[in-house]
Amino acid sequence: MSYQQQQCKQPCQPPPVCPPKKCPEPCPPLKCPEPCPPPKCPEPCPPPKCPEPCPEPCPPPSCQQKCPPAQPPPPCQQKCPPKSK
């Protein structure tokens, strides 16, 4: 007979008597922190201030001054004296 078979034929031993399992104390209930104070609202923003309206745009510089139309010189009306030799 092998050693293992001999081992198996031994009568079973009763299981050891375990001591009763001592449960740990239940956790104390979580202590809630003080409730948060309500969020403090920031001061309301002042209404957006509109920028001053722009001044009227400058009139475009009048570079193109209207010159009086060039007139041909008035024809001489003065009669030239006849040439004297």
Curated annotation (Swiss-Prot):
Pfam families the record matches: SPRR2
Sequence repeat residue intervals: 21-29, 30-38, 39-47, 48-56
Expression induction: Up-regulated by estrogen in the uterus of ovariectomized animals, with strongly increased expression detected in luminal epithelial cells at 6 and 12 hours after hormone injection.
GO aspect biological process, one term: response to estradiol
S-S pairs: none
Entry keyword GTP-binding: no
Keywords: Cytoplasm, Keratinization, Repeat
Subcellular location, record wording: Cytoplasm
Region (Disordered): 1-20, 57-85
Example of a GO cellular component annotation carried by this entry: cornified envelope
Low complexity composition-biased segments: 1-11
Region (4 X 9 AA approximate tandem repeats): 21-56
Domain of life according to the entry: Eukaryota
Ranges that cross the membrane: none
Tissue expr: Expressed in uterus.
Its job: Cross-linked envelope protein of keratinocytes. It is a keratinocyte protein that first appears in the cell cytosol, but ultimately becomes cross-linked to membrane proteins by transglutaminase. All that results in the formation of an insoluble envelope beneath the plasma membrane.
Family assignment from sequence similarity: Belongs to the cornifin (SPRR) family.
Name used for this protein in its record: Small proline-rich protein 2D
Lineage: Eukaryota, Metazoa, Chordata, Craniata, Vertebrata
Gene: Sprr2d
